[in-house]
Amino acid sequence: MIHKTDVQIRFNDIDILGHVNNAVYQYYFDLARVNYFTDILGEHEADFHAEALIVASIKVDYIMPVFLKDKIYVTTKITSIGNKSLTMIQEVFDGKQLLKATSETRMVAYSIKKQSTISIPERWKTLISSFEKDVVFKYLLDS
């Protein structure tokens, strides 16, 4: 299943070339990521005060420019879950379903109190896998 977040393009997102600046896409991905975790894990779990998912790496590909008057949305999907990390794929589309940009993010489970990585809580894996029917559990493949 795909999670969708509508994004409002703001005037200050636009650069001198008349399109959304490449740095602004990360705000769009962040907004969609927060919405995903709030919707899938629930507000209590997604407050991330004790346990969190932090970004370890991001790869963004810019496919086509986005302009001020475009109507865009971001799709978010977790494709794999390991013991301590997960992989998230996000895509920006316009109203005509044209792919504008993609992002692959690896996130790591983290204990705020211990200031160290932890295993992804089982309750998170359960909630994510109930939404993402085809998520791959990498740690099961390694066994």
Please describe what each predicted stretch is.
Residues 1-73, 81-143:
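Terminal targeting signals and extreme-terminal segments of soluble enzymes
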